[in-house]
């Protein structure tokens, strides 16, 4: 369960806990070792209760229970999917802190139905006191005002709250800001090597800088409701081909020319933006609390296994283990950045 005593830290940092590459259970044992070393909570992906049961075996103990990100196809507009959420909540009561589900484009035109369904789900969740929260994540690119409005209508649903995905909110605002200046030109059509980029880069970076204020505004709006708010933290840039977010906060985007003295562009947030998001969340959610998950997917590299080599003594080729180890090291770096952005508790 979420909520904290006065002596507890004001925000919990989680990171993705999953098997990112092909291999056996040694990869999950590696994740368990690294999570225990960095002291981060876990957020795991699970499509079925049995799948979650399996992964939880490898998650090390932590003061904050794991958060579970359900399949992105789950649509809480539908009774059968709310029943699935309830099944997870019942089976893992007392073992997980929260369940994350995505919003959907169609919800924008069915707000009343969504709110009614979430009130119904909340009533069922409240029947089991040790059960998890359910967080509706901003993911479909709907107007942020709609998202806040839904949250306000569910203010009294004590077991239902919201997840702010800073990448999704930021990219929507970046695209809108750029479109205002360049109607008819879609940012998705551009890339780092586009010949038009030198003439457009200043406006693109101006739009990129507009992401942070909007994330902070949504954070303050939800914080005023007095509920626990969960955050998915990752960086991104509209010029990245394919998936434009889910990068770490120390990443820059390489370009083939110099802009402001560098042959790379700053992403939407960077370490400074991350610090602003975290500190604003802590300030905005004093009563309900806030939690954070480092949701970084896009990592390429290998790192020697070092102290974890014994886990893979039965492997002939440890390339995938080293890839997993490198990804975990990036999660660790970003988890430390996030934890260092949380203001210390005042001395008493």
Please name every model-derived segment.
Residues 110-139:
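Catalytic cores of phosphodiester-bond-cleaving enzymes
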Residues 36-113:
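Structural motif corresponding to the early beta-alpha repeats
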Residues 66, 134, 162-165:
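Residue-level marker for buried hydrophobic side chains located in beta-strands
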Residues 14-23, 45-49, 69-75, 104-106, ...:
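Active-site beta-loop-alpha junctions enriched in small/polar residues
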Residues 131-155:
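Basic- and aromatic-lined ligand-binding clefts that recognize polyanionic substrates
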Residues 1-12, 32, 60, 81-97, ...:
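Histidine-acidic metal/acid-base catalytic patches
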Residues 1-46:
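Boundary/entry segment of secreted carbohydrate-active catalytic domains
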């Amino acid at each position: 369960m979420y909520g904290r005593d006065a002596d507890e830290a004001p925000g919990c940092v989680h990171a993705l806990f999953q098997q990112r590459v092909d291999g056996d259970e040694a990869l999950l044992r590696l994740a368990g070792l690294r999570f225990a070393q960095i002291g981060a909570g876990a957020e795991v992906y699970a499509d079925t209760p049995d799948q979650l049961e399996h992964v939880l075996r490898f998650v090390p103990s932590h003061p904050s229970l794991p958060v579970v990100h359900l399949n992105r196809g789950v649509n809480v507009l539908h009774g059968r999917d709310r029943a699935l959420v309830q099944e997870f909540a019942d089976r893992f009561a007392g073992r997980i802190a929260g369940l994350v589900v995505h919003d959907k484009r169609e919800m924008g035109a069915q707000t009343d139905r969504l709110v009614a369904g979430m009130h119904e789900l909340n009533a069922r969740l409240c029947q089991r006191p040790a059960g998890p929260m359910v967080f509706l994540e901003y993911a479909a690119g709907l107007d942020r005002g709609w998202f806040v409005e839904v949250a306000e209508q569910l203010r009294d649903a004590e077991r239902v709250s919201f997840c702010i995905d800073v990448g999704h909110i930021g990219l929507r605002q970046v695209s809108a800001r750029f479109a205002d200046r360049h109607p008819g030109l879609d940012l998705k059509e551009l890339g780092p090597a586009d010949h038009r980029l030198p003439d457009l880069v200043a406006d693109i970076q101006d739009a990129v800088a507009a992401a942070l204020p909007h994330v902070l505004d949504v954070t303050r709006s939800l914080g005023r409701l007095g509920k626990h708010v969960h955050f998915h933290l990752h960086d991104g840039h509209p010029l990245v081909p394919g998936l434009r977010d889910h990068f770490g906060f120390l990443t820059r985007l390489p370009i083939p020319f110099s802009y402001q003295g560098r042959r790379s562009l700053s992403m939407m947030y960077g370490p400074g933006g991350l610090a602003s998001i975290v500190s604003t969340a802590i300030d905005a959610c004093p009563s309900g609390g806030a939690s954070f998950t480092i949701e970084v997917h896009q990592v390429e590299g290998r790192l020697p296994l070092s102290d974890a080599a014994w886990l893979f003594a039965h492997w002939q080729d440890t390339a995938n283990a080293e890839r997993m180890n490198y990804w975990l090291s990036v999660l660790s770096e970003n988890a430390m950045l996030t934890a260092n952005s949380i203001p210390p508790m005042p001395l008493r």
